[in-house]
């Protein structure tokens, strides 16, 4: 085992258990999908649940459902009456993801939809107190602006994969479109006066964003 794997194992032994259902979902994701590591996993999943419990949102928007692991974790933290709206643009994931979401103990709190969140989320006609962004890295900035337009003042955005395996600092990836998208997003929000930002070196980079201002200054 690598040093990172040893530390991860230690952490998992000292936090809330993942639970049998999520364990089986994570395993199935790695067996039956091409990019299984994209699932949040035990450590980040427990953090997502805790953050929801701390923020106590009424509505959460998730951009990028993938296998449903993070959606279930987010929904686990929701208070009574809370709702998670989650969008997956890849319709080929639906046959895998929908049964796992519908079979979970929090299925009644999750509204799972296939479609482009940047187009479909504004059509819901509702606002959100929290959002988890984990979709197409090439359009992260566009997604951020869409989400911010639906976010209530004082709300929070969590953006995943913001360090992108370290590619954000590696010039070898200067021409990679996904790396470019992440860099563009990171550079923009670091200077956006509407928000406060922290980048956490958790897994592939997790960025909590606090929405503090209504509009850009003129």
Model-derived regions: residue spans:
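Short strand-turn motif at the edge of the Rossmann-like AdoMet-binding core
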Residues: 89, 136-137, 160-163
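SAM cofactor-binding core of SAM-dependent methyltransferases
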Residues: 42-103, 108-118
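A short acidic, Gly/Pro-enriched loop at the edge of an enzyme's catalytic core
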Residues: 123-130
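Receiver (REC) domain switch-region micro-motif
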Residues: 60, 131-134
């Amino acid at each position: 085992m690598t040093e990172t794997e040893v530390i991860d194992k230690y952490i998992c032994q000292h936090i809330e258990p993942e639970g049998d259902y999520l364990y089986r979902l994570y395993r199935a994701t790695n067996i039956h999908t091409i990019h299984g590591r994209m699932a949040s996993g035990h450590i980040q999943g427990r953090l997502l649940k805790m953050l929801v419990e701390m923020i106590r949102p009424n509505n959460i928007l998730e951009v990028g459902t993938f296998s449903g692991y993070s959606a279930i974790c987010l929904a686990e933290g929701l208070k009574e009456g809370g709702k998670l709206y989650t969008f997956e643009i890849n319709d080929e994931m639906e046959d895998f993801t929908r049964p796992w979401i519908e079979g979970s103990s929090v299925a009644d709190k999750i509204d799972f939809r296939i479609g482009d969140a940047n187009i479909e989320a504004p059509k819901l006609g509702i606002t959100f107190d929290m959002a988890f962004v984990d979709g197409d890295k090439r359009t992260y900035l566009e997604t951020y602006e869409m989400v911010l337009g639906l976010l209530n003042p004082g709300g929070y955005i969590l953006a995943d994969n913001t360090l992108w395996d370290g590619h954000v600092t590696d010039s070898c990836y200067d021409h990679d479109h996904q790396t470019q998208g992440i860099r563009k997003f990171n550079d923009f929000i670091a200077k956006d006066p509407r928000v406060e930002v922290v980048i956490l070196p958790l897994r592939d980079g997790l960025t909590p964003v606090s929405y503090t201002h209504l509009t850009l200054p003129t």
